[in-house]
């Protein structure tokens, strides 16, 4: 919005030309989201407390968590509002990619909101059934995947009301390398052709998988939000490079017109995430809830598939991957041993993995900070693939 206003007024006020620079708008999006989050955080926490939207804590988990019972949840609303306002203020409204990411983010946020609402207001610990939640995740993920597969290839910029016009004719052939190939990190000449069906399936799996992986990781004070910020920042760098014709050519990446605008979204996510961490750091004043975790995970997955860095997301988000695998392994092993021995056995003290370390003697803050450190290293490894190819 501010970009269009600045372009309209820049002939009379030349200093407004600075708004045309993507990096300037990215910085401002970060600051704007940070300020909104810090300014409205106390009010949101107070309102959630008044509404008695408190988190129920499982008694079978670490006993140190029992003191958290009643802490306001659904704080992810603060993150999403901060991202939305900041992104819409500083992005180019005609960019297709921005709207796709926003659709997935807030669509998954709506799923999480309903799930949280049922848990804390209706006092239903199950929330949405797994089948119901998966159905809506699948629907939104497939809509995004199909749109990205068949949307116009040549340019990402259109008028807002033209976002869904002539979309099939522009994308059926999938003639752009960034759409049809899976890019393999560290190898500049190796990529795997996907085709239409392959692209849609991969996009769907990455979006839904990323959303659920981030949600599973959200179990300790401050644990998930910092990795989300770090991975989002890393993907923002890829978006900037892939969207810049000069940098993408120099680094031997396919040029994706308009992808650089996703840096605005990633920067807003970073600012909103840091603001939320201010209140979510141990001891947490508010929890994110599914409304935030599902949405942010979906956002990371969507950005990754747009910039064709699905494997890099797997690397940078290694903590999310390991946490998810720990749950899958725990459930699978329990079922196998129950059939074989008549009694289920566990691979870990408790899943997801962060609870395993807690029950092993690590303090909550130790688990959190150590997972942050691991994520920092993984993000650096992911960023190294820009040059080490």
Curated annotation (Swiss-Prot):
Q: What is its main location?
A: membrane
Its biological function?
Answer: Catalyzes the initial step of the lipid cycle reactions in the biosynthesis of the cell wall peptidoglycan: transfers peptidoglycan precursor phospho-MurNAc-pentapeptide from UDP-MurNAc-pentapeptide onto the lipid carrier undecaprenyl phosphate, yielding undecaprenyl-pyrophosphoryl-MurNAc-pentapeptide, known as lipid I.
Q: Which residues cross the membrane?
A: 25-45, 74-94, 97-117, 134-154, 190-210, 222-242, 259-279, 286-306, 311-331, 366-386
**Pathway involvement of the protein, from the record:** Cell wall biogenesis; peptidoglycan biosynthesis
**UniProt cross-references to PROSITE patterns, sorted A to Z:** MRAY_1 (PS01347), MRAY_2 (PS01348)
Question: What is the protein named?
Answer: Phospho-N-acetylmuramoyl-pentapeptide-transferase
What cellular-component terms does GO give this entry?
Answer: plasma membrane
Q: Which domain of life is it from?
A: Bacteria
What keywords is this UniProt entry annotated with?
Answer: Cell cycle, Cell division, Cell inner membrane, Cell membrane, Cell shape, Cell wall biogenesis/degradation, Magnesium, Membrane, Metal-binding, Peptidoglycan synthesis, Transferase, Transmembrane, Transmembrane helix
Q: Name one GO biological process term.
A: cell wall organization
| Reaction catalyzed | UDP-N-acetyl-alpha-D-muramoyl-L-alanyl-gamma-D-glutamyl-meso-2,6-diaminopimeloyl-D-alanyl-D-alanine + di-trans,octa-cis-undecaprenyl phosphate = di-trans,octa-cis-undecaprenyl diphospho-N-acetyl-alpha-D-muramoyl-L-alanyl-D-glutamyl-meso-2,6-diaminopimeloyl-D-alanyl-D-alanine + UMP
Listed InterPro entries: Glycosyl_transferase_4, PNAcMuramoyl-5peptid_Trfase, PNAcMuramoyl-5peptid_Trfase_CS
Question: Keyword Magnesium: yes or no?
Answer: yes
Q: Which family does it belong to?
A: Belongs to the glycosyltransferase 4 family. MraY subfamily.
EC main class here is transferase
Q: Name one Pfam family in it.
A: MraY_sig1
The record lists the organism as: Cupriavidus taiwanensis (strain DSM 17343 / BCRC 17206 / CCUG 44338 / CIP 107171 / LMG 19424 / R1)
């Amino acid at each position: 919005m501010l970009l269009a206003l600045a372009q309209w007024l820049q002939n009379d006020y030349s200093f407004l030309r600075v708004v045309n620079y993507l990096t300037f708008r990215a910085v401002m999006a970060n600051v704007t989201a940070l300020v909104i989050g810090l300014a409205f955080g106390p009010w949101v926490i107070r309102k959630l407390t008044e509404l008695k939207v408190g988190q129920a804590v499982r008694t079978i988990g670490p006993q140190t968590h029992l003191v958290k019972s009643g802490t306001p949840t659904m704080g992810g609303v603060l993150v999403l509002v901060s991202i939305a306002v900041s992104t819409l203020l500083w992005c180019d409204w005609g960019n297709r990619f921005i709207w796709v990411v926003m659709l997935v983010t807030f669509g998954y946020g709506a799923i999480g909101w309903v799930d949280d609402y049922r848990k804390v207001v209706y006092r239903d610990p199950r929330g949405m059934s797994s089948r119901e939640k998966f159905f809506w995740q699948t629907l939104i993920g497939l809509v995004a995947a199909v749109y990205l597969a068949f949307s116009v290839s040549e340019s990402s910029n259109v008028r807002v009301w033209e976002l869904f016009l002539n979309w099939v004719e522009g994308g059926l052939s999938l003639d752009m390398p960034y759409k049809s190939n899976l890019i393999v990190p560290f190898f500049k000449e190796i990529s795997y052709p996907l085709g239409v069906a392959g692209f849609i399936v991969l996009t769907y799996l990455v979006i839904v998988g990323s959303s659920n992986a981030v949600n599973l990781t959200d179990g300790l004070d401050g644990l998930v939000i910092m990795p989300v910020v770090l991975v989002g920042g890393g993907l923002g760098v890829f978006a900037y490079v892939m969207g810049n014709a000069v940098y993408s050519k120099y680094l031997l990446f396919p040029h994706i017109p308009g992808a650089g605008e996703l840096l605005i979204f990633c920067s807003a996510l970073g600012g909103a995430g840091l603001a939320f961490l201010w209140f979510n750091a141990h001891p947490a004043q508010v929890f994110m809830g599914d409304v935030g975790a599902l949405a942010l995970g979906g956002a990371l997955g969507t950005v990754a598939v747009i910039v064709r860095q699905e494997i890099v997301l797997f690397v940078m988000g290694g903590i999310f991957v390991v946490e998810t695998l720990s749950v899958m392994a725990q459930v699978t092993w329990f079922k196998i041993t129950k059939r074989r021995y008549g009694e289920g056995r566990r691979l870990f003290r408790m899943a997801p993995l962060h609870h395993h370390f807690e029950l092993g003697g690590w303090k909550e803050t130790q688990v959190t900070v150590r997972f942050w450190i691991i994520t920092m290293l993984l993000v650096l490894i992911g960023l190294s693939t820009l040059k080490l190819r």
